[in-house]
Design a protein with these regions (language model features):
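Glycine-rich, acidic/polar active-site loops that bind/position phosphate-bearing ligands
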Residues: 1-240
Length: 240
């Protein structure tokens, strides 16, 4: 049952004096990658691969088992997106503090915004190279979870924490490019790449996390999990 930890990245911990956060890979006792170690599966990593992750999440109140600020009068979602004001934005202090912590830790956090549902927020991470991108999103999540403890809150990443209701779920949109995509300026090339996903889309969905069938319904700015599409500025497409 013993496992080994292999340090792979280190970040200063802005919250603790002279502290550091060390990202590790988990190895079996014989040195082989543990089954949970997805990082070890990355091969041919290259700084030419650019990733932009948009991580959505809910600030979750354990006492009510609902999002922070969830309306008691069942006010429908809509007014909370990119909102301001005490009737609309709940938990901005946490979001702002998380932004500062990530910046001070050297994580390339690109932005934040209030999301569609009450108590729902998003932060964005950019990195060059798959391993670095994964390291930064995981460490940013860790900082967020630890920060929420100070407020007696949890961070909820479930794709559809409010179930089959008229409230958005959470995902993590992944923006990707390489030199070809950034420089070709060819609609035909973009469409050919998107089409290459069509026969293997189920293989991708299988490793994108649990419960995505609850979120990918075709509603709330999603494509159905059983369909595949792409389009320019199409928020209901599989690939936008």
């Amino acid at each position: 049952s013993d496992c080994l930890l292999k340090p792979v990245a280190i970040y200063p911990d802005p919250v603790r004096k002279d502290g550091w956060i060390v990202m590790n890979e988990v190895l079996n006792s014989d040195g082989s990658p543990h089954e949970s170690n997805g990082r070890a599966t990355i091969d041919d990593d290259d700084d030419d691969f650019w990733f932009g992750f948009e991580q959505e999440y809910f600030l979750w109140d354990p006492e009510t088992n609902l999002p922070l600020g969830f309306p008691k009068d069942q006010t429908p979602q809509g007014q909370f997106y990119c909102s301001v004001g005490g009737k609309n934005a709940f938990g901005r202090e946490i979001m702002d503090r998380h932004l500062d912590i990530c910046i001070d830790a050297g994580i390339n956090i690109e932005g934040t915004n209030a999301e569609v549902a009450a108590g729902q927020w998003e932060f964005q991470i950019f990195a060059k190279g798959a391993a670095k991108a994964g390291d930064e999103i995981w460490v940013a999540r860790y900082f967020l979870e630890r920060l929420a403890e100070e407020y007696g809150l949890a961070i909820e990443y479930h794709p559809k924490p409010l179930g089959a209701t008229d409230w958005n779920g959470s995902g993590m949109h992944a923006n990707f490019s390489n030199t070809t995509l950034r420089t070709c300026g060819s609609k035909e090339t973009y469409e050919a790449i998107c089409e290459a996903f069509r026969p293997v889309v189920n293989e991708h969905i299988a490793v994108y996390g649990a419960y995505n069938d609850q979120r990918l319904t075709g509603d709330h700015e999603t494509q159905s999990i059983t369909e595949f599409s792409y389009g320019v500025s199409d928020r209901g497409a599989s690939i936008r």
